């Protein structure tokens, strides 16, 4: 019920705000939009999905929102963690997505957590963090409850391999 209410509030906000409607129009024009249904079908049917596309096609900003909105549309809650290779990326991508959704970072469904800084609300459904932050969370004593609460883990920019991302993929395997 709460999930449907959140989705309805977002739709109403977009419908009543011309600047948000303009942002939604631009989102619809991104190249990744053409593959939205295929991506969501793959996510629903598989435990692991690899999404590849050219730089700027919208993978980073749109795929997490597609997954979140799909969960809400189907009456399911979502707890999505999306890793970024750098702290600045985790911060800027989360701010961009919050802006696209007409929300304030850390006071909405979108937040970020980096080393020594966290902007996350109790309603956060889409958390951006570095690979290192997620790795530490998964290897902590509370990792069992964390794993049970997460619905999706998105590792962005995996081709930019580093030690944290390599260990993260091993642990998730």
Task: For the regions a language model picked out, list residue spans one by one.
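Interdomain "pre-motor" coupling segment immediately N-terminal to P-loop NTPase/helicase cores
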Residues: 1-15
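Conserved P-loop NTPase motor core
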Residues: 12-173
């Amino acid at each position: 019920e709460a999930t449907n209410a959140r989705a309805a509030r977002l739709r109403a906000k977009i419908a009543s705000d011309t600047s948000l409607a303009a942002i939604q129009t631009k989102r619809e024009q991104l190249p990744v939009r053409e593959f939205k249904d295929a991506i969501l079908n793959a996510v629903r049917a598989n435990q692991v999905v690899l999404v590849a596309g050219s730089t700027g096609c919208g993978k980073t900003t749109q795929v997490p929102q597609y997954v979140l909105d799909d969960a809400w549309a189907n009456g399911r809650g979502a707890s999505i963690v999306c890793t970024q290779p750098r702290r600045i990326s985790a911060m800027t991508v989360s701010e961009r997505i919050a802006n696209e959704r007409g929300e304030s970072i850390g006071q909405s469904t979108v937040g970020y957590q980096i080393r020594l800084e966290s902007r996350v609300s109790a309603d956060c459904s889409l958390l951006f963090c570095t690979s290192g932050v997620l790795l530490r969370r998964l290897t902590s004593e509370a990792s069992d409850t964390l794993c049970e609460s997460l619905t999706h883990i998105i590792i962005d920019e995996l081709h930019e391999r580093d030690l944290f991302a390599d260990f993260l993929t091993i642990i998730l395997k």
